[in-house]
A protein has these predicted regions:
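Conserved Rossmann-fold NAD(P)-dependent oxidoreductase catalytic core, especially the SDR/UDP-sugar
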Residues: 87, 91, 96-160
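Glycine/proline-rich active-site loop of Rossmann-fold NAD(P)-dependent oxidoreductases
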Residues: 180-182, 194-207, 239-250
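Mid/C-terminal beta-alpha module of Rossmann-like enzyme folds, strongest
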Residues: 5, 235-300, 318, 332-346
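N-terminal Rossmann NAD(P)H-binding glycine-rich loop of SDR-like oxidoreductase domains
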Residues: 3, 9-33, 38
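Active-site Tyr-X1-5-Lys
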Residues: 155-184
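A conserved pocket-lining segment of Rossmann-fold NAD(P)-dependent short-chain dehydrogenase/reductase
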Residues: 96-97, 152-156, 198-199, 206-231
């Protein structure tokens, strides 16, 4: 491994106010590193410090700079003196955009903006958060996926899925053609679950909240792998320091497909009465197809019927020495954090 001791320069984390970003900050601070993170506006800085302190990390080793992925200002200051950059920030649409480029262009250009700044200021390695969305959305029927698989953004896919594939491809192309000595490693998790550190919920954690509150009495038969947010954070740290990680992408997940109904059963069996409102039934494929005529959410689910993706995580285990938590632990810890922070409406 690199000689990266806590006394060396700061590690830059983009998007430290986000769900994954806050866990990456926490993991770095707990490991004794000095950390610099970016926020889009100054009013987010205090919340980032408060979250770090609440998680038990030392916010005194945390520096915050303002830099927006949509503008050049601030990035030279952000990367100055850093050997490593963990590029975690990426746009996630709160609603369906009017045009797919509203999501695709900011994701691609933001990644390139970070990479250019890193190259120009002598950063050794960038670890970029991509997604399984960039890996496994162009095959029907599921099956086993590894790092050689790629999603084709020319397919009929959601803007978010396309954005992950386009941004990651652009990052690899830039590094090969213009990166100079800059190294790139990429982390590709599926849906990220696990405990929240503050009251701002990701879409995936919001799904668990909805299950606990009874907002989803039934769920479609959708299958997917799960990554624990703490495991994804650790994968970033290991990819940052492991020499063999340079030039590689890593699938991060349990390696076993679960389903929405399977998650509901984990909640019911693990929490008893506290999960009394969890989904009690899984829709049949026929019900999904019928509902897809009028329900946009079911329309997307209908396109996934019969798809059971399995992620091969052998490379992450072998190269990074990484091991995932179980789905049960991840789901129950997600719920536990929601109850602890008072985020579940009775």
């Amino acid at each position: 491994m690199y000689d990266l001791n806590p006394g060396s320069g700061p590690v830059l984390v983009t998007g430290g106010s986000g769900y994954l970003g806050s866990h990456v900050l926490d993991a770095l601070l707990r490991a004794g590193h000095r950390v610099r993170t970016t926020v889009r506006s100054p009013d987010r800085a205090e919340g980032v410090r408060a979250t770090a302190a609440r998680a038990g990390a030392d916010p005194g080793r945390l520096e915050i700079v303002v830099a927006d992925l949509g503008a050049d200002e601030g990035w030279a200051e952000a990367v100055k003196g850093c050997e490593h950059v963990l590029h975690v920030a990426s746009p996630f649409p709160a609603r369906q955009p009017r045009h797919e480029d509203e999501v695709i262009v900011p994701a691609r250009d933001g990644a390139l903006r970070v990479l250019r700044a890193a190259r120009d200021h002598g950063v050794r390695r960038v670890v970029m958060t991509s997604s399984f969305a960039a890996v496994g959305y162009s095959r029907t029927g599921g099956g086993a996926y590894d790092e050689s698989d790629w999603t084709d953004p020319g397919d009929d896919l959601t803007p978010y899925v396309k954005s992950k594939a386009v941004a990651e491809r652009a990052a690899w192309d830039f590094t090969a053609a213009e990166g100079g000595g800059l190294e790139l490693a990429v982390i590709n998790p599926p849906g990220i679950f696990g405990p929240v550190l503050d009251r701002h919920l990701s879409a995936s954690v919001g799904l668990v909240k909805a299950m606990l509150e009874g907002a989803l009495p039934v769920v479609p038969p959708q299958y997917f792998d799960v990554a624990d947010v703490r495991d994804v954070a650790q994968a970033h740290l290991r990819a940052m320091t492991e020499p063999a990680a340079a030039g590689e992408r890593f699938l991060i997940g349990t390696g076993t497909a679960t389903s929405l109904y399977g998650m509901a059963r984990i909640l019911a069996e693990g929490l008893g009465e506290r999960a009394a409102k969890a989904p009690a039934r899984e829709l049949t494929p026929e019900e999904v197809r019928e509902g897809a005529r009028t329900d946009p959410a079911l329309r997307e689910a209908a396109g996934q019927l019969g798809r059971v993706p399995v992620l091969r995580t052998d490379k992450a285990r072998a190269v990074l020495g990484w091991e995932p938590r179980s789905v049960e632990t991840t789901v129950l810890d997600t719920a536990g954090s929601l109850f602890r922070l008072g985020l579940v409406d009775a």
